[in-house]
Amino acid sequence: MAVPKKKTSKSRRDMRRAHHALVNVTGAECPNCGEVKLPHHVCGSCGHYDGREVVAQAEA
């Protein structure tokens, strides 16, 4: 079984964990339907991106 040869210092441990923070996801309003969507992504509600329909939505 593998074991560390030396104890990891608090500084090295914390530097490794520096990138583990969670970030809030920012949402943008779809100009077509007003739903919240991810920036630079197709709207999941209406299928529009950059002013045009790229995903055809089924009529419900």
UniProtKB/Swiss-Prot annotation:
GO biological process, one term: translation
Single GO term (MF): structural constituent of ribosome
UniProt key word Nucleotidyltransferase: no
Listed GO CC annotations: large ribosomal subunit
HAMAP family hit by this protein: Ribosomal_bL32
Family statement drawn from the similarity comment of this UniProt entry: Belongs to the bacterial ribosomal protein bL32 family.
Name used for this protein in its record: Large ribosomal subunit protein bL32
Native organism: Paramagnetospirillum magneticum (strain ATCC 700264 / AMB-1)
Lineage: Bacteria, Pseudomonadati, Pseudomonadota, Alphaproteobacteria, Rhodospirillales
Gene name as annotated: rpmF
